[in-house]
Regions:
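Conserved alpha/beta core segments of nucleic-acid transaction machinery
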Residues: 132-142
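The conserved beta-strand core of Leucine-Rich Repeat
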Residues: 7-10
Length: 142
């Protein structure tokens, strides 16, 4: 079931659901909107019980592979310690295992990498974006 939750409410309830994997485990999960997520080893994902009407937001520490269900009215956002990855329906991997660095690899579709200090960097399939927390720079590699 869907609920009408605004952004500020989402932030407060996101702590209610937390899924963690450890050295010897990984995990696949599917959200109510059809988005699939694979959590790699030593990863924590925080998420709301239900996505809101304007956005779908999760919080990641570690590495996860996302197969995001298309929804042009509700972008999917992955928030990390260094910035945000935003998209509307695509497949990508986010890795935050190295402190101060977020790596995003796009498999198909398009995503934007948004450093905490502002700016937006779009990447294409096959590209790797590396966000450095100390400088807030985003580097693209092919």
């Amino acid at each position: 079931p869907k609920t009408d939750v605004n952004e500020s409410e989402e932030v407060s309830v996101v702590e209610n659901n937390k899924l963690s994997t450890y050295d010897d485990s990984e995990f696949w999960m599917t959200f109510e909107d059809g988005t699939r997520v694979h959590l790699n080893y030593n990863t924590t994902l925080k998420y709301p019980p239900h996505f809101g009407t304007t956005t779908r937001t999760v919080y990641l520490d570690g590495e996860a592979y996302f197969q995001v269900a298309k929804d042009s009215k509700r972008p999917f956002r992955v928030i990390t310690a260094n910035g945000v990855v935003k998209q509307y329906g695509t497949t990508f991997n986010v890795n935050t295992h190295v402190p101060g660095i977020t790596k995003v690899v796009l498999v198909k579709g398009s995503v934007s990498v948004l450093p905490n200090q502002g700016g937006e960097y779009k990447i294409k399939p096959g590209e790797l974006a590396v966000l450095q927390a100390d400088t807030q720079d985003v580097y693209r590699r092919y």
